[in-house]
């Protein structure tokens, strides 16, 4: 059986026609799934009994089961552990803002990138998620909170560009007016910096925001923090970013997790200013999430602000990320790992 969420409307139409069914039934089915959030074919009232049986025999609506749901004390952040049909568990985080609800979705079960500050990668990668499985996190979360989600961040477990085909199909699906109709400008894709895939993504000409996990302007330190830096130097990464900016005319966000005594010095801030000077970019400074498997400590607020001020003085737009959901392990990979380790 196949997950119907992996299908575009046109693909489902073609399948129905091949079974001597009416093509317009595909639109009716999509309406039930994406607008009414009905995930059982038998509850789709305007679908004939014969067609329901045909669909049930060949497809399932692959929305995951909620195995854990946590809500922060301020009620603005929800953390979900979702379980797929094969028993694999991933996590998603919903953040409520005045401008709308945002979800951070996972693209893989685990991750193989090995970034030292990330809990998602500690057990390696188990498998890629399909386009429909990524999409299903949004649908399951919408059903749980009873509200529409209008912004998507691909920044949960997994490296999106390490699952390129499924992630790009997800982008095509989620932005389609036949499914969730989320605007491309409301989507952010975060990557540790797989250079050839950044260029390939640029050639797709999406209007999404690309976020690069940078974390150091120096190759030696970046190699220590992020194994991907052993393959691609900062020079190569910046060349790929320039290609992306020139191709899409979209501003890039550089994520920079500040670790006390490691990458939060004035010297590092000045070097970062030099690396990014003149680029169409924005820097998001992040107090690092402390995990027991490493000795990384959060930089002090004073250091973070001083670091940011140097960037601003050099004409680089900079913000400090607001921490949300710290009381519910909302950082990437923390909740899933504590759950599966039991």
From Swiss-Prot:
InterPro entries: Aldolase_TIM, Methyltransferase_A, RlmN_N, RNA_MTrfase_RlmN, rRNA_lsu_MTrfase_RlmN/Cfr, rSAM. Pfam families: Radical_SAM, RlmN_N. Its main location: cytoplasm. Its cofactor is [4Fe-4S] cluster. The keyword rRNA processing applies. It catalyses: adenosine(2503) in 23S rRNA + 2 reduced [2Fe-2S]-[ferredoxin] + 2 S-adenosyl-L-methionine = 2-methyladenosine(2503) in 23S rRNA + 5'-deoxyadenosine + L-methionine + 2 oxidized [2Fe-2S]-[ferredoxin] + S-adenosyl-L-homocysteine; adenosine(37) in tRNA + 2 reduced [2Fe-2S]-[ferredoxin] + 2 S-adenosyl-L-methionine = 2-methyladenosine(37) in tRNA + 5'-deoxyadenosine + L-methionine + 2 oxidized [2Fe-2S]-[ferredoxin] + S-adenosyl-L-homocysteine. S-adenosyl-L-methionine binds at residues 158-159, 190, 213-215, 289. Residues 97-327 form the Radical SAM core domain. NCBIfam families: rRNA_mod_RlmN (TIGR00048). Belongs to the radical SAM superfamily. RlmN family. This is Probable dual-specificity RNA methyltransferase RlmN.
């Amino acid at each position: 059986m196949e997950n119907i969420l992996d299908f575009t409307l046109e693909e489902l139409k073609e399948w129905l026609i091949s079974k001597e069914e009416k093509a317009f039934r595909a639109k009716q089915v999509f309406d039930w799934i994406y607008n009414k959030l009905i995930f059982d074919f038998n509850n789709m009232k305007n679908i004939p009994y014969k067609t329901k049986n045909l669909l049930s025999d060949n497809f399932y609506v692959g929305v995951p089961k909620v195995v854990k749901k946590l809500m922060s004390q301020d009620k603005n952040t929800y953390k979900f552990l979702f379980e797929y049909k094969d028993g694999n568990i991933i996590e998603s985080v919903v953040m409520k803002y005045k401008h709308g609800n945002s979800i951070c979705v996972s693209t893989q079960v685990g991750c193989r990138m090995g970034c030292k500050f990330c809990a998602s990668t500690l057990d390696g990668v188990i498998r890629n998620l399909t386009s429909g499985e990524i999409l299903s996190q949004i649908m399951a979360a919408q059903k749980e909170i009873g509200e529409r989600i209008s912004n998507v961040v691909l920044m949960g477990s997994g490296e999106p560009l390490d699952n390129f085909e499924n992630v790009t199909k997800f982008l095509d699906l989620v932005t389609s007016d036949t499914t969730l109709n989320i605007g491309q400008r409301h989507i952010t894709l975060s990557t540790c910096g797989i250079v050839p895939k950044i260029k390939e993504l640029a050639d797709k000409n999406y209007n999404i925001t690309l976020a690069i996990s940078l974390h150091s302007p120096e190759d030696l330190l970046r190699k220590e923090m992020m194994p991907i830096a052993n393959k691609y130097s900062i020079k190569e990464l910046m060349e790929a970013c320039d290609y992306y900016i020139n191709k899409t005319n979209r501003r890039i966000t550089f994520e920079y997790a500040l670790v006390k005594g490691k990458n939060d010095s004035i010297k590092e801030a000045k070097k970062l200013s030099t690396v990014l000077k003149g680029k169409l970019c924005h820097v998001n400074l992040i107090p690092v999430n402390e995990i027991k498997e490493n000795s990384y400590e959060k930089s002090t607020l004073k250091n973070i602000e001083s670091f940011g001020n140097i960037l601003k003085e050099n004409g680089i737009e900079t913000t400090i990320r607001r921490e949300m959901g710290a009381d519910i392990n909302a950082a990437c990979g923390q909740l899933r790992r504590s759950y599966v380790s039991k």
